[in-house]
């Protein structure tokens, strides 16, 4: 088991920015991230853009000075609860560090941040074929979203613009 620490990302810090882009690119190239490298233009401006987004929060897991895991979150709002929520937009752990508690530690950092911000819940989406991630999220306390079992579970959809 690797020894690691989780720290909040300073988007304008060069070391943090490079680590975030490195980890996000590794995730993007993974089959569960789409299997393609990040667009170089997006990589170049990502952290500058994130620094301008109110409610953006990222955390990196570091082991021996090397980045090994990442979680990117964005604050949203629950109209039913009239409180903020925190959406986990990306979570990724380098393959050689999976199964060592890194993902759980990243989720804990996000939860702690959400509680400090007065959020009512954490949300995330996961591919149905990503069984290890689904098991990790369930272990952490996530469950399928539904308001009434008779109405079914929520489905995540998108439309490219």
Question: What is each PLM-predicted segment?
Answer:
Residues 3-83, 89, 108, 147-150, ...:
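Acetyl-CoA-dependent GNAT
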Residues 3-12, 22, 118-161:
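C-terminal "cap" of GNAT-fold acetyltransferases
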Residues 26, 30, 79, 99, ...:
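Conserved amphipathic alpha-helical interaction elements at protein-protein interfaces in regulatory
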Residues 76-78, 96, 129-131:
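Short coil/turn motifs at secondary-structure junctions
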Residues 84, 100, 116-120:
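Short coil/turn segments at alpha/beta junctions that flank glycine-rich nucleotide-binding fingerprints
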Residues 89, 94, 98, 127:
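Residue-level recognition of the GNAT/N-acetyltransferase active site
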Residues 93, 99-112, 135, 139:
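Conserved acetyl-CoA-binding loop-helix of GNAT-fold acetyltransferases
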